[in-house]
């Protein structure tokens, strides 16, 4: 069961990828909010366009706010992705899609100081013949960095339930074995008693015990 819980997110992503390849759709999947120190962390930001065939000028801005601090720019996409001067410089990697519906970034070698609030701003200016509407979307990602990977609560509950089920099945099988053993033992004892009683009867009594046949 824990293995299924660990494989379920992977299977879901595979299905989403397969659907996106077979059918061009956009799915706004929320980002994970927990990272482990020293590992890369993908900050997922997806902003779907309802009409993909419409051309649009897209600008992406990533901000970071430490606990008790203020927002400051760490990454910008404007006619090409570029990293700005910040404490994250050299550790950010563009992970977006070509159509700029997925504008995610990856933080390399995550540290404990990277905990905080990340903001993804996506600004689009659509190019229609009559007008050029402007749309802005915002995604907030509260990130918590830990020293070691924590155990998933669902996996813990699944493991506990699995062990309880195994104990219950073991006890049930043990009770069934004891019940069957006693039942067989009683049947053997009854058979032995009947055989002993039959052997204890004298031969004369055995002949007399026969029922006479009336003429």
Swiss-Prot record:
Its main location: membrane. The lineage of its organism: Eukaryota, Metazoa, Chordata, Craniata, Vertebrata. It comes from the Eukaryota. It comes from Macaca fascicularis (Crab-eating macaque). Coiled coil: none annotated. This is Sodium channel regulatory subunit beta-3. InterPro entries: Ig-like_dom, Ig-like_dom_sf, Ig-like_fold, Ig_sub, Ig_V-set, Na_channel_b1/b3. Glycans are attached at residues 95, 109, 113, 121. Belongs to the sodium channel auxiliary subunit SCN3B (TC 8.A.17) family. The gene is SCN3B. It is found in: Cell membrane. Intramolecular disulfide bonds favor the voltage-gated sodium channel oligomeric complex assembly. A voltage-gated sodium (Nav) channel consists of an ion-conducting pore-forming alpha subunit functional on its own that is regulated by one or more beta subunits. Forms homodimers and homotrimers. SCN3B is non-covalently associated with alpha subunits and induces the formation of alpha subunit oligomers, including trimers. Interacts with SCN5A/Nav1.5; regulatory subunit of SCN5A/Nav1.5. Interacts with SCN7A/Nav2.1; probable regulatory subunit of SCN7A/Nav2.1. Interacts with SCN10A; regulatory subunit of SCN10A/Nav1.8. Disulfide bonds join 26-48, 45-120. Regulatory subunit of multiple voltage-gated sodium (Nav) channels directly mediating the depolarization of excitable membranes. Navs, also called VGSCs (voltage-gated sodium channels) or VDSCs (voltage-dependent sodium channels), operate by switching between closed and open conformations depending on the voltage difference across the membrane. In the open conformation they allow Na(+) ions to selectively pass through the pore, along their electrochemical gradient.
């Amino acid at each position: 069961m824990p293995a299924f819980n660990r494989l379920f997110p992977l299977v879901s992503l595979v299905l989403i990828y397969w659907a996106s390849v077979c059918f061009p759709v956009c799915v706004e999947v929320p980002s994970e909010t927990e990272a482990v120190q020293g590992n890369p962390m993908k900050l997922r930001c997806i902003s779907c366009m309802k009409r993909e065939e419409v051309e649009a000028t897209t600008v992406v801005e990533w901000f970071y706010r430490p606990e008790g601090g203020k927002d400051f720019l760490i990454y910008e996409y404007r006619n090409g992705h570029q990293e700005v001067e910040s404490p994250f410089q050299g550790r950010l990697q563009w992970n977006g899609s070509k159509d700029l519906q997925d504008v995610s970034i990856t933080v390399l070698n995550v540290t404990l100081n990277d905990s905080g609030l990340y903001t993804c701003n996506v600004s689009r200016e659509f190019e229609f013949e009559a007008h050029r509407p402007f749309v802005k979307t915002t995604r907030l990602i509260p990130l918590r960095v830990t020293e070691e990977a924590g155990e998933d609560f669902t996996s813990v509950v699944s493991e506990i339930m699995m062990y309880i089920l195994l104990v219950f099945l073991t006890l049930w099988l043990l009770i069934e074995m004891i019940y069957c053993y006693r039942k067989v033992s009683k049947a053997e004892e009854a058979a032995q008693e009947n055989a002993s009683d039959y052997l204890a009867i004298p031969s004369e009594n055995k002949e007399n015990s026969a029922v006479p046949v009336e003429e």
